[in-house]
């Protein structure tokens, strides 16, 4: 697969997380448009183009990891109707300064180097609570942290 086709996953309301394969070089127009439950996207270094409205209306999107050292070209309204001002964008350490000046990437509320992506349970911070118990489990192939009857992913987001 070298391209995620036009409208390929558009409207998939049950899609919560996407990791694009390393073989992909382009994400076409409206590919993930209106995936309202999508919370995170992982874009590989191989992607050079992201089409018009590719992630438009992904209203739950809060984390984007873009591993492309060379900033991918982007069509119009890639993140329209996405709360990117409160989302986190992780980019290659050596490219942070470039992404800061390139649209639509510059619109993200928080931009951090990829080296700061939480990678394990040890990176999750939970406020001190004397009676709390924290337990790491694997659920559906994902690491989940259980804390006071709630479940969290390794990014610290509450999950069901």
List each language-model region with its residue ranges.
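Short, T/G/N/S-enriched strand-turn elements that build extracellular solenoid repeat scaffolds
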Residues: 52-56, 73-81, 100
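C-terminal outer-membrane/trafficking sorting elements
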Residues: 118-160
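Structural signature of tandem-repeat unit edges
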Residues: 1-3, 12-26, 35-49, 58-73, ...
């Amino acid at each position: 697969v070298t391209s995620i086709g036009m409208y390929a996953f558009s409207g998939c309301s049950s899609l919560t997380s996407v990791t694009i394969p390393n073989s992909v070089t382009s994400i076409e127009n409206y590919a993930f448009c209106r995936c309202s439950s999508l919370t995170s996207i992982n874009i590989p270094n191989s992607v050079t183009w992201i089409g018009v409205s590719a992630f438009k209306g992904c209203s739950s999107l809060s984390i984007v990891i873009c591993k492309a050292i060379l900033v991918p070209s982007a069509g119009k309204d890639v993140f329209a109707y996405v709360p990117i001002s409160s989302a986190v964008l992780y980019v290659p350490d050596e490219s942070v300064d470039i992404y800061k000046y390139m649209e639509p990437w510059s619109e993200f509320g928080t931009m951090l180097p990829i080296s700061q992506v939480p990678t394990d349970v040890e990176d999750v911070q939970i406020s001190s609570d004397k009676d709390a118990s924290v337990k790491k489990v694997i659920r559906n192939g994902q690491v989940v942290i259980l804390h006071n009857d709630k479940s969290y992913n390794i990014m610290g987001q509450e999950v069901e």
